Design a protein with these regions (language model features):
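A structural signal for short loop-to-beta-strand junctions that line the ligand-binding cleft
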Residues: 81-83, 89-92, 120-157, 189, ...
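Short helix-initiation/N-cap motifs at beta->coil->alpha
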Residues: 68-79, 99, 169-174, 249-263
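C-terminal lobe and pocket-closing loops
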Residues: 273-288, 297-396, 426
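Extracytoplasmic/periplasmic solute-binding protein
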Residues: 135-136, 140-144, 149, 173-222, ...
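Glycine-centered hinge/linker elements that transmit conformational signals in sensory
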Residues: 176-180, 220-251, 296
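Hinge/lid segment of periplasmic solute-binding proteins
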Residues: 98-148, 173, 189, 201-204, ...
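Conserved N-terminal structural module of periplasmic/extracytoplasmic solute-binding proteins
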Residues: 4-102, 121, 285, 300-301, ...
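Paired acidic/hydrophobic, glycine-rich loop segments that form the ligand-binding mouth/hinge
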Residues: 92-95, 268-273
Length: 428
């Protein structure tokens, strides 16, 4: 998830966010400049600009320079790590994939926010989002936007052929074959998902493992604790491509490539995030009024499918020279007011459950209550400081299985050996 460059003057909304008594104090008397690193928000409009203007009008004593991070999450993390490791990163507030919080906190790169937050402040957010902001009982970040993996489907095509949204992957495959045979459209793809070698591929595989009733890390720390089921998941994903149920370019596909193809009416099913829902309903969208939402399916060996929950948090660099201003900015952008503005833009979904049932927002975005329920049913990626090592080790192995360079059995065996060695060296 990633965003356009804004350079705006901002200010610390202490009164608005209620942190006047609990914020750390900056020294000096003149305006301070806070550098905010964020990624481009994917949606119909960018909500940051009006929020930053509002913030600047309230508090002209703080100047905020908002700067865009690279496009992909892997490149974002690389940029942040390189700069944070030097101890003088050149930015104060950063947008974080929530899965990075334990790693960044353990490395000493984040300011511990616990002393500066009123008790219970994180209780207004989804429990999974609040938990992702914590490490070893301390609060290291503030939840900003929420994500969950969803199944999008062409409701018009399913209705035309007397089908319901699939609850299993066997039903999804059968629906693709039935609809394509009846439609006679050689350009109509079946199931779009993210198979490029990056974090998105790991997420898709994690969801496949959950759908099969297994996971990547066992309670005892074993990698792929049920190797046979893991191999079956990889065979299924590879088979989607080789059997033409997913396009051959799946192995180079990310969120935007798949979202655009589905949005042009070129596929029956899509695995993606909530941001896509509002883009499909734009006035000029070829699929407007034709798209439904459902949970991700399950495999025959599983009891239920589950989308990966995630999203973005805001953290404050431990080396900031302006902690009061930085925390004020982070609290403003994650406040109920700011999350409402962001939700109204259609760019992102909030981390505050109450907004999913707000009458005005539901009128504008009828899918919100459904997304709320699917978010509650989702599952987080493994919460561990070693997650990035887990992900970066898995990415080439999983990609090799998808393109047929390795068999699923080889991928699972090689991944287990490498990861168990690395994780043991890190103490898990």
């Amino acid at each position: 998830m990633t965003r356009p460059i804004l350079v705006v003057c901002l200010a610390g909304a202490l009164a608005l966010t209620g942190c006047a008594d609990s914020s750390p104090r900056d020294g000096g008397g003149g305006p301070v400049t806070v550098v905010f690193k964020h990624a481009k928000l994917l949606g119909p409009v960018d909500p940051l600009a009006p929020l930053l203007v509002e913030f600047a009008a309230l508090h002209p004593e703080i100047r905020v320079r908002a700067e865009a991070l690279p496009w992909s999450s892997d490149e974002q993390r690389q940029f942040l790590v390189i700069n944070l490791e030097g101890g003088n990163p050149g930015f104060d507030v950063m947008m974080l994939d929530c899965i990075w919080v334990p790693e960044f906190a353990r490395a000493g790169w984040l300011l511990d926010l616990t002393p500066f937050l009123p008790p219970g402040e994180l209780a207004a957010h989804f429990p999974s989002a609040a938990e992702a902001a914590r490490y070893r009982g301390r609060d290291w970040a503030l939840p900003w936007m929420m994500n969950v993996g969803l199944l999008y489907y062409r409701a018009d095509l399913l209705a035309r052929h007397g089908l319901r949204p699939p609850e299993t992957y066997d039903e999804l495959v059968a629906a693709i074959r039935r609809i394509r045979a009846a439609e006679g459209n050689p350009r109509l793809e079946g199931y779009l998902w993210q198979g490029k070698q990056y974090e998105g591929l790991v997420v898709n595989v994690l969801e496949g493992l959950w759908a099969a009733g297994t996971r990547v890390l066992g309670d005892d720390g074993r990698v792929f604790p049920d190797p046979e089921r893991a191999e079956a998941v990889l065979r299924f994903l590879r088979g989607l491509i080789t059997e033409g149920l997913s396009p051959p370019w799946t192995t180079a596909a990310d969120e935007e490539i798949t979202r655009r193809a589905f949005g042009q009416g070129e596929a029956i099913f899509l695995r993606s995030w909530p941001y896509a829902a509002d883009l499909f309903e734009l006035p000029d969208s070829p699929v407007r009024g034709k798209v439904g939402l459902a949970p991700l399916p399950r495999h025959a060996t599983g009891t239920a499918g589950a989308g990966s929950t995630g999203g973005a948090h805001l953290g404050v660099a431990r080396g900031t020279r302006h902690p009061e201003a930085a925390i004020t900015l982070a609290r403003f952008l994650t406040s109920e007011r700011a999350q409402r503005v962001m939700a109204e833009s259609g760019a992102v979904k909030p981390t505050r459950p109450a907004l999913y049932h707000d009458p005005a927002l539901v009128r504008a975005f009828p899918s919100l209550p459904r997304i709320h329920d699917l978010t509650l049913a989702g599952r987080p990626r493994p919460v561990t400081p070693a997650y990035v090592i887990l992900s970066t080790t898995l990415q080439p192995e999983l990609s090799a299985a998808l393109v047929g360079v390795k068999t699923p059995a080889e991928t699972v065996a090689h991944s287990r050996r490498r990861l168990e060695f690395l994780l043991e060296g890190l103490g898990g």
